[in-house]
Regions:
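Bacterial N-terminal signal peptides that target proteins for export
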Residues: 1-11
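Sec/Tat signal peptide C-region and signal peptidase I cleavage site
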Residues: 21-26
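Metalloprotease/metallohydrolase-associated module, dominated by Zn2+-dependent proteases
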Residues: 29-109, 153-208
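Structured segments of extracytoplasmic/periplasmic soluble domains
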Residues: 124, 132-153, 173, 177-184, ...
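Bacterial N-terminal signal peptides
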Residues: 10-20
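Mid-length scaffold segments of soluble, non-membrane domains
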Residues: 86, 90, 96-143
Length: 208
């Protein structure tokens, strides 16, 4: 009778882890939470300044951002030894995302024009951060499939090492995907915001 062995195989934080005839089982666990930081202002310049000084910082940087998504990967795998070979019998990848968004606390009394600009910008910030969370969930699924597809090894120690290497590579790939997304978004930011603002103005019948 083969004996299962369970090990934690990955844990990473970003400012972005039976019987012999049973098939390998996967179970991605994704959770998401939200938090907010308050900003104040009566003009677009004041709101912009507040975002620049009160926004969250990204991992490894002191620069402030209008929004952020903290990502934490984790997981565990169960290995089963039989016939001189060890394989993964169960893998569970977890990913928790915390989306940090701005909240305009003294909006009452603001002009319709400024409110429309803010609604356009804040909606785009939320969309951007939600996409970061989605990229993390998609990568967790890829990592899980790759781990379950790994070939059996001579020992469970070797199997665990291979899982660790695969997990590390998956997280590195995740970081590159997130950076590429940010680069594309930055290039298109101004045109995108102007287009969204024009669409919002048209749908509301204009700003008075």
């Amino acid at each position: 009778m083969p004996s299962p062995t369970r090990h934690m195989f990955l844990l990473a934080a970003l400012c972005l882890t039976a019987s012999i005839c049973s098939p390998a089982v996967a179970a991605v666990v994704a959770t998401k939470s939200y938090s907010y930081f308050d900003i104040k202002g009566k003009t677009a310049d004041e709101l912009d300044q507040q975002l620049s000084t009160r926004g969250p910082t990204a991992s490894g940087s002191s620069a402030r951002h209008p929004g952020a998504t903290k990502i934490r990967f984790g997981g565990e795998a169960t290995y089963i030894q039989d016939g001189g070979r060890c394989r993964v019998s169960h893998a569970k990848v977890t990913v928790h995302t915390q989306i940090i968004l701005p909240r305009w606390s003294n909006r009452n009394g603001a002009s319709k024009q400024l409110s429309m600009i803010w609604d356009t910008l804040s909606s785009d910030i939320k969309r951007h951060e939600e996409r970061h969370a989605e990229i993390a969930r998609e990568q967790a699924k890829k990592m899980e499939k790759r781990i379950l597809a790994l070939p059996p090894q001579r020992t469970c120690e070797a199997m665990q090492e291979l899982v660790t290497v695969t997990s590390t590579r998956g997280i590195e790939e995740h970081d590159r995907l997130q950076a590429r997304f940010d680069q594309v978004e930055a290039v298109n930011f101004q045109n995108r915001i102007l287009r969204l603002l024009n669409n919002r103005i048209k749908s509301s019948g204009g700003v008075h």
